[in-house]
Amino acid sequence: MARIVGVELPNNKKVWVALTYIYGIGRSRSFEILKNTGVDPDKRVGELTDEEISKITKYIQDHFKVEGELRSEVERNIRRLIEIGCYRGIRHKLGLPVRGQKTRSNARTRKGPRPSRIKTKKKSS
């Protein structure tokens, strides 16, 4: 397994697919990286040479924020929105959809599970 920017990539996958395992790299970015480093996208990760792995790693580190750095930036941005008290920040704080979706009947994932009601036994008279 090749290790690129701290992520173990499976040997049996094609390189362009394996790069999408890295947080912050999707399909189009994966192809961009491989085009600029001169690596064949259809090559398997197990077939990569050490030189190709180091070229890919260097390109990613020089051009993109990925993994922990990207996660912390996103988290900081959300914290800032909450701190300044804007509409989006309030929605984040309340755990509701942020981008204008309706919430009357949907948004179950974002709202979370409903609090369950305590069942009481009926007295038999």
From Swiss-Prot:
Subunit structure: Part of the 30S ribosomal subunit. Forms a loose heterodimer with protein S19. Forms two bridges to the 50S subunit in the 70S ribosome.
Biased composition annotated in UniProt, kind: Basic residues: 101-125
Function: Located at the top of the head of the 30S subunit, it contacts several helices of the 16S rRNA. In the 70S ribosome it contacts the 23S rRNA (bridge B1a) and protein L5 of the 50S subunit (bridge B1b), connecting the 2 subunits; these bridges are implicated in subunit movement. Contacts the tRNAs in the A and P-sites.
Family label: Belongs to the universal ribosomal protein uS13 family.
GO CC field: cytosol; small ribosomal subunit
GO biological process entries: translation
The encoding gene: rpsM
SUPFAM superfamilies linked: S13-like H2TH domain
UniProt name for this protein: Small ribosomal subunit protein uS13
The keyword Heme is annotated on this UniProt entry: no
Keywords of the record: Ribonucleoprotein, Ribosomal protein, RNA-binding, rRNA-binding, tRNA-binding
Organism: Thermotoga neapolitana (strain ATCC 49049 / DSM 4359 / NBRC 107923 / NS-E)
